Amino acid sequence: MAAARGSIAEDRAAQTLPDLPQCASGRSAIHSIAVPLDPSRRTHHAGEVHPRKSIPPELRRLAAEQADVLTREQALGLGLTRSVLHRLLTQEIWTPLASGLYHTNGTRASWQSLAWGGVLVGGDQAMLCRRAAGHLWAIHPDPPETIQILIPDEVRLQDRDCWQFIRTRNLPGSTGSPPRSPLPDTVLDLCLDD
């Protein structure tokens, strides 16, 4: 009896359903039919993949000029979105050197990158001085572990990591890239340090 009921049910289904493509197993292959979607009916779903936004060329140029170091303000000001910045940091493509300061090439930061980082933390008028400037002027042979940065007297910064901030009321004009104290000032500072 069970066999008879199965046959009747199959006969009814065959009468009411249109002929569907069949798989090799004899099952309907309706799931394999691709129906083009109307683009106007697409909705956003969580987890949907979006094309990655690239880093703006101006930002890449600035990073190259600054030994692969950028501030958060520079990145956002030159067109990077907060979400792209977040992705670069979470995927460790960019690494933080300090709060709001990033190394952008995915490798360990070089001394030059750390020097630029200190200048950027120090602000618009900051410049390398003493042994750090002496190293860049090629009168101090080895890059110093502590990078000394000259800042205006009114700027208050705590020394941190490899950076020592030295305040002065008589800030000389900087030169070079990264900004550093002029050669005569650097020589005098090094003579006084010894």
Please identify what each model-predicted range represents.
Residues 2-194:
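Short gly/ser-rich loop at a beta-strand->alpha-helix junction or flexible surface loop bordering the NTP-binding
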